[in-house]
């Protein structure tokens, strides 16, 4: 795996340049999952967890891309998104050529590339793909899809960190090890994340950015830009169920929002979800153990909303421990996220009618 400037890549690949087929990022044979913007031949996105699938013939695939800051990625070659990616790497340049696969055998292959860090770490743009063989039509979306709306827990803040007192590092943030990805893998579902660290329903962490909370950010096409707004017609998927895991930051730093404000904003978020996907789409509202009042706040919002197919649950104090299950800054590590997923998976099964199979959560 290598990341090179376009000039250096051109020099290294000069002998093979005539053999490459260049395919624009916007080609319909390439499948993107998550909120993205197509601008001409480019495709841009900044939300955690957005991923693309490319099927191709031949031994080689590279991507021409750029990033506004320093985004990290997970890569899989010829396999599904397992907990352990084949490789992880950073894109920290405006014009970069990343070799995704080389030296493969003859025949069809597939790569999956997932953005593992959140929007504050950078906005990623795919320009084109270089291959020696033909780009093939993507295999198609999975029959199941889950949308997760959340904060740093959903982003994967600190999931790869070794200790709860470790500081945040972008390279240890990995959305693929969160309860969301674990749940999607268990059900064999595609998934997308609408998540941002520090976000609350009515109050963000330490009251940062007052008046601008997840019910507002949820409407955006990009995590870090208030415009343009996202429309359901922009996505090629409709979730079978939506999960909200928010409220921890509302009760952060020893403070809490007024219940009426929390309830109003929560209902607004629920109404946005129902407007996007229809009244029959089930929504699961999860509360952490951050504060004993959080569950009551969520239950009140769901009840007062009067909306159909909305359920609520809480992750109890004993779902995970404060030692071995914690990563950076007291956020759950992979072990902790497995335990959170194990709490919610039965609810998802009941809401959707999906069977619970006898297999591990991973």
Outline where the language-model segments fall.
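Conserved beta-strand scaffold positions in the cores of enzyme catalytic domains, especially
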Residues: 148, 191-193, 312-314
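Conserved SGNH/GDSL esterase-like catalytic core that processes O-acyl groups on lipids
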Residues: 49, 116-121, 159, 165-260, ...
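Alpha-helical cap/lid subdomain in secreted, periplasmic
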Residues: 78, 216-361
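Bacterial N-terminal signal peptides
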Residues: 1-5
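N-terminal secretory targeting modules
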Residues: 8-149, 153-175, 353-362
């Amino acid at each position: 795996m290598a990341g090179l400037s376009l000039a250096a890549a051109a020099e290294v690949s000069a002998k093979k340049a005539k053999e490459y087929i260049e395919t624009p990022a916007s080609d319909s044979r390439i499948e993107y999952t998550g909120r993205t913007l197509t601008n001409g031949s480019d495709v841009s996105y900044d939300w955690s967890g957005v991923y693309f699938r490319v099927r191709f013939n031949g031994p080689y695939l590279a991507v021409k891309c750029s990033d506004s800051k320093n985004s990290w990625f997970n890569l899989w070659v010829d396999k599904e998104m397992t907990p352990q990616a084949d490789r992880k790497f950073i894109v920290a340049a405006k014009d970069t050529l990343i070799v995704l696969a080389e030296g493969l055998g003859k025949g069809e292959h597939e790569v999956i590339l997932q953005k593992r860090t959140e929007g504050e770490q950078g906005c990623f743009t795919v320009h084109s793909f270089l291959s020696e063989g033909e780009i093939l039509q993507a295999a198609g979306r999975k029959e199941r899809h889950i949308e997760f709306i959340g904060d740093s827990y959903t982003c994967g803040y600190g999931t790869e960190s070794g200790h709860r007192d470790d500081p945040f590092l972008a390279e240890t943030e990995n959305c693929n090890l969160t309860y969301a990805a674990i749940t999607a893998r268990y059900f064999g579902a595609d998934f997308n994340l609408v998540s941002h660290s520090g976000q609350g329903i009515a109050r963000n962490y330490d009251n940062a950015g007052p008046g601008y909370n997840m019910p507002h950010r949820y409407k955006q096409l990009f995590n870090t830009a208030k415009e343009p707004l996202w429309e359901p017609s922009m996505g090629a998927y409709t979730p079978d169920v939506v999960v909200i895991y928010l409220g921890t930051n509302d009760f952060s730093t020893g403070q809490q929002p007024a219940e009426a404000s929390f309830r109003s904003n929560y209902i607004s978020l629920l109404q946005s979800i129902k407007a996007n996907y229809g009244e029959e789409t089930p929504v699961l509202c999860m509360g952490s153990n951050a504060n004993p009042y959080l569950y009551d706040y969520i239950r009140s919002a769901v009840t007062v909303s009067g909306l159909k197919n909305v359920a609520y649950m809480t992750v109890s104090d004993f779902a995970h421990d404060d030692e071995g299950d914690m990563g950076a800054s007291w956020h759950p590590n992979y072990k902790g996220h497995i335990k959170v997923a194990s709490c919610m998976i039965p609810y998802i099964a009941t809401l959707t009618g999906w069977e619970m199979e006898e297999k591990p959560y991973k």
